Amino acid sequence: MRANADNPEDAELSRGFGAEGIGLCRTEHMFLGDRKQIIQTFILNEDPAVREKAVGELLAAQTGDFLGMFRAMDGLPVIVRLLDPPLHEFLESPRALDVEIAKLEAAGGDKALIAEKRMLMEQIDGMSEANPMLGLRGCRLGIVYPILPVMQVRAIATACAELQKEGLNPKPEIMIPLVSVVAELEKLRKVAEDTIAEVAAEQGVELDIPVGTMIELPRAAVTADEIGAVADFFSFGTNDLTQTTFGFSRDDVEAEFVPQYLAERLLPYNPFATIDPGVAKLVEMGVELGHKGNPDLVCGVCGEHGGDPDSVKTFHTIGLDYVSCSPYRVPLARLAAGQAALAEKMGDGRDK
């Protein structure tokens, strides 16, 4: 039983609830607040020197974040997902900028500032995508902007090395998101391994940091034997796997027609709350194929289904090694996992 946590406070809370590790640490949440301006500078400037300076600032900040996370979970695994969302999520809304420009113009504001805001709006508009959740995000970001995964892996490895020198036992694992073809994982795994080796040499320590991937696209599930051969672990991202299997946009369908589908019994339940049998088949296929590629592959789930008792029982039947959910759902998920294991044991006893 693991938990989803993005900061040391949630990690400590999870540990108190009995979590045996962190199944998902979302690094994009570490880029918000005061750091949002830094990532915006990286995105909006093509000058290599400016980008390099921004990445240096992010490296220092992320190293501090990981020091806190790994210290809080000393001796337990912490799966860190590299940057996943589309970059536009870190930028200002073009609509909000348009309103701001209109207000400045109405008030007779500074023309240079208005021109600057208008140029920024045009730049952000130029980065927009028709379907950003299936566009430039996940591992694709790391391939298009290789400096980003290098920075994040260096921060993870540096934090790990520093804590090892303190006599602690940090256990980070690196997760590469949204892989659809094995070549993506091969490319980014090499980036990670090369960076880890550099940090280990600089720090004079040995670093053993597993590298795995999220299985959240149908193609990844049905080619999991290929992907598993170059992964240390799989984590099934069942939120996105449900979206891409159904062809649903969760943000839209839950408000627009899922209630009607439930009322008319076109769906037996909300598939984003409890795992759908069709999606579960993809998970099962991914586990079976993944183990063909790598018999030692560790498989878990980090979507919201990890905290749903009915889904937990399904995952136990499939043979997953762990589930991960929000800290406050850990006790309920632990109970469901225990009940599933007991039911299986009693069933085995009756069979004998």
What residue ranges belong to the model's regions?
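Conserved alpha/beta-domain cores
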Residues: M1-K352
